[in-house]
Amino acid sequence: MRSFFPSASFGSPLAITGHIGPTRATAGDSASESAVRPTCALTVRAALMLAAMTGLLFFAPPCWAAEPLLAPERSIGAVVDHYLDEKLKAAGVSPAPAADEATVARRLYLDLVGRIPTASEARRYVAAKESDKRARLIDELAGSVGFAHHNANEFDRLLAYGNPGAPSLRPYLLAAFKEQRPWDRMFRELLGLGAAPEKPETFVLKRLGDQDALARDVSSVFFGLNITCAQCHQHPYIASLTQDYFFGMQAFFARSQDFQGNLIERQAALPATYKAKDGTTRPVIPMFLSGETVALPAVDAAEAKKAFDEESKRIAELAKEYAKNKTLPPPAELNLRQRLAELALSDANRDRFARSLVNRLFHRLYGRGLVMSLDQMHAENAASHPELLAWLSRDFIDHGYDLARLIRGLVSSDAYARSSRWDSVEPPAPGLFAVAAIRPLTREQWGVSHQVASDPTKITAHERLDHPHMEALVAAAKSYGTLIEQPYDDLQIGVNEALKLSNAPELAKSTGAKLAAMLAKLPDRSQQIDEAVWTVWSRAPSSDEAALLAAFLEQRSTPPTESLQQMLWALVNSPEFRFNH
């Protein structure tokens, strides 16, 4: 067996000495992968022919399903396995075997509640004899408060879209996941079309000063298409994605305004234009990615200016009295953000809205999206498994955009539980999903898991409690998490992270202090080592690992508790802890 790590096993001397980062072989689409795409190519060819007549090439589904889909009553996990296995067979590739039970348990805890399991939780799962124990664990974790906290972290990062200055929407997201709000409702609320007390409209409010970024982020996050390249010229890869689309998406927010911290829609607006690449001046018309436009009343420029100025004066007067009476300007007859939501969720367009989120969740849980890159979902960028993407999107829509149901289904497949180890020199193409991806932990996952490994009683005390205690745990984890990089595709752990961790005396001092004290009370060395490895790595140590750790402790001249803490520090700084494998 060959591991993706630079040694034969996670618990090697390299791991103990604090080596960080896998040396994973990377490969593009192999010949075997591309050879099984004939129906996909035909679909793209048909889309190209249609585009020549309609001019809507880029919005055509990304290699949409060429074959009839499986029946809707099939389970999500079974459908994932069917389509992935079908392509593996066509490519002549046998998948990796199932991961061991301890690895599956750790993977589920990290993906569903954002932390490693405690030693007792991991042991309990491995020891359980029920044939449906994995399904039971998924139900338990998805029904816990940790599920809401973890998804609040994950979606907060998604909505920030890589902008470190983006406002945190975590309080809103936490409430939304606790109440199990569907994704379409959350979309409306984030556009300022609901009455959520946690102010999700901050997503728009804090971007009003940069409407270019607002148009980009809305298109990318919710519809899987980054339209930035069309801001100044025709998109280089999508022939029909012109400047009209960029400014058309931007126009949906042209009347939005920050009024004393409230997102309002103005009634009046000045006619807007932009200078096209060919030098002509063109009017800005609200236009969705489908090419559908919103008709605006024709007005004389002078009359529009007069109406705009008069409304501005009324808004200014209301602002002066807002502190006293909290009176908002009257709602506009035409709310362009409302029209954007209606267009996006219409029967004709909702599949794009659904596919974008499905693809992002698949990427999060499997290490790769069905379409890569995640914000380049268009007809010229084929999905690796178009029928699977189509089925999952249809299922997501048919079940009311239920996020928890989709996540639970995705982690129920056999493919999700595959081993991350491969027994040949080169692993198969990533797009085949033949072997589990090794995924770096997010800052939040690493920070909370670090606390669990250092003092497992924190979870015992707080895992079932609500907001205040869990929030304290998350807040403490964030201070640790800043020492590591947030994951991105093809991340390679660099020397900077190793240096930060090597020069964090307060972290080193706190890591495992309480656990080391607990271990020191155990009667013999083998029990200490066994408990340490179960706590940090969520599994039993191998005989070689146990011998290595015993030798390490025997060589220490420091007090027993301090020696144990040094051992724990090495375990926490190993690749096995840093990655979800």
Model segments located where?
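Aromatic (phenylalanine/tyrosine) cluster motif
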Residues: F4-F5, F10, F58-F59
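Residue-identity detector for glycine
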Residues: G11, G18-G21, A25-D29, G55
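Bacterial N-terminal signal peptides
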Residues: R45-P62
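Short, structured secondary-structure elements
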Residues: A66-R282, R352-S393, L403, I407-L519, ...
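Long, low-complexity, polar/charged, intrinsically disordered or flexibly structured peripheral segments
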Residues: A295-P330, E342-L343
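Structured secondary-structure scaffolds
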Residues: K313-R314, T327-L357, H363-L365
